[in-house]
Each structure stands twice: as C-alpha cells, then as structure tokens.
C-alpha cells in the first residue's frame, strides 16, 4: 500500500504547474455594456521589468498601445488617450482601463513582459483578455 501511495504523490507533484510560469491576464473574457468601464489586469513574469499592452482585432490586426519599463511609461503612442489609460504601480502588475466603452473597443487585449536588457526585447505574451462591448 505504501509504495502505491508514494507513487500517487509523486505523480501529483510532477503534474503540478509551476507558479509564475508566464504572463497572467485577468479576466480572460469580459462582457460589458456600452458606456461602462472595463479594467484589465496583467501580471508580468517575475523579474521582468518591461510590460507591453496590445489590442488585436480582425480588421486592424495587432496594434501597439503602450509600454512600461521599471514602472515608468516609456511609449504610449498607440493609446487612444481620451478613454484609455494604463498604469504599472509596481513590478507585480499593470492595468489597462477603458472608460465609457464603445462597441469598437471589442477586441483581444494582450499583455507581454520582457526582461528589458540590452537593445532588443524578447516579449512573452499572456493569453489575452477578450473584451466584448454590447
């Protein structure tokens, strides 16, 4: 009996997923009404100091929104600033807020993180948040 129990325990530990294995985005799906506020969360990979936000639609494809390095906004040239805002208050998360949502805001919003070392940035993407505005 003891060897079988030990075998089961070993299997359980082998199947356990590591924490902080990748970029985490919440919620995965969000449905909201026109004129509401939507807040999207991103948790970068531990140790990564750069966070990027993108929006992806069928018509426009992947669009850059904003980029943070060491919590400071570096480039927000892609942000529709009248209703969109992003923050990175600490190294553990970033938020993207959309005020007064419109149907054209319906898209998949992607967050990526990077070590931010050297000249190039190898980005690791989260699963995305699918926002639907009715």
Curated annotation (Swiss-Prot):
Disulfide bonds join 42-111. It comes from the Eukaryota. Residues 116-119 are annotated as: D segment. Glycans are attached at residue 90. Residues 120-134 are annotated as: J segment. The keyword Lipid biosynthesis does not apply. Residues 20-115 are annotated as: V segment. The keyword NADP does not apply. Coiled coil: none annotated. Residues 1-19 form the signal peptide. This is T-cell receptor beta chain V region CTL-F3. GO terms for biological process: adaptive immune response; cell surface receptor signaling pathway. It comes from Mus musculus.
């Amino acid at each position: 009996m003891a060897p079988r129990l030990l075998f089961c325990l070993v299997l359980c530990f082998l199947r356990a997923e590591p924490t902080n294995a990748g970029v985490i985005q919440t919620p995965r799906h969000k449905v909201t009404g026109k004129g509401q506020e939507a807040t999207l969360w991103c948790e970068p990979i531990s140790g990564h100091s750069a966070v990027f936000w993108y929006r992806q639609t069928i018509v426009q494809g992947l669009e850059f929104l904003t980029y943070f390095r060491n919590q400071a906004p570096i480039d927000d040239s892609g942000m529709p600033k009248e209703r969109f805002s992003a923050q990175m208050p600490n190294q553990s998360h970033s938020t993207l807020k959309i005020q007064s949502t419109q149907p054209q805001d319906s898209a998949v919003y992607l967050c990526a993180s990077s070590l931010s070392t050297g000249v190039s940035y190898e980005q690791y993407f989260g699963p995305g948040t699918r926002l639907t505005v009715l």
